[in-house]
């Protein structure tokens, strides 16, 4: 069937901020859909609240709304867009299948509330009936029964009484799955009545439709997924089979997964394939991709259907990257009427999309967790997803892919080789948790049988035998020295996936250049080097036109280097807190810009969720770990073509930055800011000296390499002090210490340090305003992109603070000083590309906190606010072009990039709901997973919109509970008065209430948790409180504070932990009380700015 000509405009709903359970994979799928539909000539409108995405770039859609993803805001966008359509235009369609669960839920809300009918909007990609049939647990169960497929025995529960009754019939354990939630939120396994009551209560609260599916436990069964596509002509193909290494009971997002499935016989696979095709047809997904999950009982082969996603999912992104088949792009084209046989495969340019992909390699995905960021969080894994990112690796065998995947995670952790107590290993094997794979390896290394490990873990014996072979190779290698190992044995170890670093560790090799370099040189001397194979969807049956490559130790190379001038861009690896999608955004922009400038762009990354690992983002994609060995091999392979080559390290965050000096030492041309300058900014003593020479103030500070030195220096500097390790991103292991005892505890427990990696100790500036500055520099000229004022005070990690552009109340003198210091620093550090500077302003004095001569996480946000693609310009500066080519007027006038008449507020999004035991207080260690942006012509409204987009809806009436620490109590009355003036009642604990009453404020007193009843937690649970302002007492949260903040999360009450954010909330609430808010299309804002501000013409940029 040809494309639909009856449609003229298509609205795509994005997935919003990065959260656990819904990550960068939806930027990848949304961006593909936008490009595909624009190329087909449709008018594309995008709604998404996340400024850090490629899909929200103004060129990806005709109009882009960075607005809160709520039914109210979407209705306003639909109203405006419908009104803009000329008479006689085609239909207005909504595509809800590329924005994850968020978009699907919103589409259902808009349909059920009548909004779609009101504005004559049609759904494409998935019809309402199909969405409901797949998402509603009861309808899905009935549909499976109709086609004769088995499902777990289950019941849909709306109250505690029915839940207990069902448990009496079926017995424990029971699996709980709340309806319409994300990443298994609220899910769990109940082993007894008490756990059932607790989990069921929480699950009912979290489900938007107040329902939870209780089902029989299939713990320990094998789990599989099939990724399918269907078109309007009822052609159905299976793109990829995926097998979970971990058995049922662990959320698939927290499980190691393998593609294609390894332990199914051909007959079993065909039965599962036929069942999946029956499912997609019965549910009624007319077009696009679907993911169907199965479980099989290893004892008797019983197969059951677990669930189906009638949309592009996390597994779709993995299947896309595993096969090279662009699922989201093809799903978008199917949604507008094409059939699979009418779409050509971009990779082969010969085969149609109805050819099922064939794999002649193995793909392994391993999740990345960060429980160390959340002390007190339960690290066991279950039906609720907890990982923050993932790495993917490709090899010719499972063993090779697994070993490459493990080193792609960059954990740097390994269990010691010496024996661990048997009872500890047993405990670690029985319960799924992030380090279980290491304990499995450890058990096998120390003689445990595969049968024993299988009985404890229920991991399939086939996988365990593979791990046993790795363990045996490990043990054998450890018994020899490097000189005793011949070329054949070394080649076998490399084929198994052992890295040079791992081999050097096993051989205890020592060398001045570094042990792994010694192994590298031994390999090369024996001619043992990787070759590069192509991911081509057809197992090399047809020629591939998109070089999507992976390394292996075989004979034939499929990726001869070209003779074009080229740039290698090092990506950021798996998403993690502190190094997320913002850095991938910068890598993509570098690839787009340099490709336009005639360079062959080469991307190196191992993250399957991202746009950077899409087959058409760069000219060549190496899906490889970001380690010295892997990058060096790629560089030498590409350089052998003889063409000019450069390597960019400053866009991918800390991961590639850590490689800058070793690469340069090996003769690799690192372009942009030199590795020496990067190192100078990171080296505390040398950087302090530079600031003194430039006459730029900094908080008093020093370094320490021992506990005694740390205590002496902290006492000398004066408390409070900020302590942190050197060379980290995301505020890893940072702490504000208010007394000597806290410094001692930090040095003993929190951090590893050495002569090379000292601990940094700075005086902490209390009641200071923090400011972030992003700028562009070519080594001579410098232009500031944005001076962002933090809404949280200094001491809260910059990634966890809301910030506003332009600044709200910084004086002209402070702004002038910031510009002067920024220009001085850019010149002194010889920055070529991007630089980020963090300042603290205390009583009008400007201090430098730190300088990062690289891309920062705020670059996408500043680019969206100003309309200037900073990362694209930075990439071009690194290849030798000058800033005057792009921003001549800004240089002449000394002007920052302009933001027009609007305020842009960026707010963080936190995973507190996934870690209910964790305190929500903010500090110098970053804990947010994503971000949103609010845009308005006044600060209050922009802040309110950002808070709403982040899931923290500010109330417009009701009662505010205020409890302030000793330092903040003096401001209690003034703050309370602002809320009283807005019509709120005030509740406070006795100490804060005294201050308020002294200031003439009427206040209701309430007990602290340990003082009596009813206390503040009782009021929260009784829905008496609409907002909480609770500033922490010190480094260690008091029992009362934690209880309050935890109760607030459960009740989903907005909670603010700093005075400055409370003041911003007052402005936000006032704006909401004034009435209707406005929505803005990014393209219109940028057009108005360029017309109204001649000082910002961006030359020569697409």
Swiss-Prot record:
It catalyses: hydrogencarbonate + L-glutamine + 2 ATP + H2O = carbamoyl phosphate + L-glutamate + 2 ADP + phosphate + 2 H(+). InterPro entries: ATP-grasp, ATP_grasp_subdomain_1, CarbamoylP_synth_lsu, CarbamoylP_synth_lsu_oligo, CarbamoylP_synth_lsu_oligo_sf, CbamoylP_synth_lsu-like_ATP-bd, CbamoylP_synth_lsu_CPSase_dom, MGS-like_dom. ATP 1 binds at residues 137, 177, 183-184, 216, 218, 223, 249-251, 293, 307. ATP 2 binds at residues 724, 763, 765, 770, 795-798, 838, 850. Residues 411-559 are annotated as: Oligomerization domain. Mg(2+) 3 binds at residues 838, 850. Residues 141-336, 688-879 form the ATP-grasp domain. Mn(2+) 1 binds at residues 293, 307. Its cofactor is Mg(2+); Mn(2+). GO terms for biological process: 'de novo' UMP biosynthetic process; glutamine metabolic process; L-arginine biosynthetic process. Mn(2+) 2 binds at residues 307, 309. Keywords: Amino-acid biosynthesis, Arginine biosynthesis, ATP-binding, Ligase, Magnesium, Manganese, Metal-binding, Nucleotide-binding, Pyrimidine biosynthesis, Repeat. GO terms for molecular function: ATP binding; carbamoyl-phosphate synthase (ammonia) activity; carbamoyl-phosphate synthase (glutamine-hydrolyzing) activity; metal ion binding. Mg(2+) 4 binds at residues 850, 852. The large subunit is composed of 2 ATP-grasp domains that are involved in binding the 2 ATP molecules needed for carbamoyl phosphate synthesis. The N-terminal ATP-grasp domain (referred to as the carboxyphosphate synthetic component) catalyzes the ATP-dependent phosphorylation of hydrogencarbonate to carboxyphosphate and the subsequent nucleophilic attack by ammonia to form a carbamate intermediate. Large subunit of the glutamine-dependent carbamoyl phosphate synthetase (CPSase). CPSase catalyzes the formation of carbamoyl phosphate from the ammonia moiety of glutamine, carbonate, and phosphate donated by ATP, constituting the first step of 2 biosynthetic pathways, one leading to arginine and/or urea and the other to pyrimidine nucleotides. Belongs to the CarB family. This is Carbamoyl phosphate synthase large chain. It comes from Koribacter versatilis (strain Ellin345).
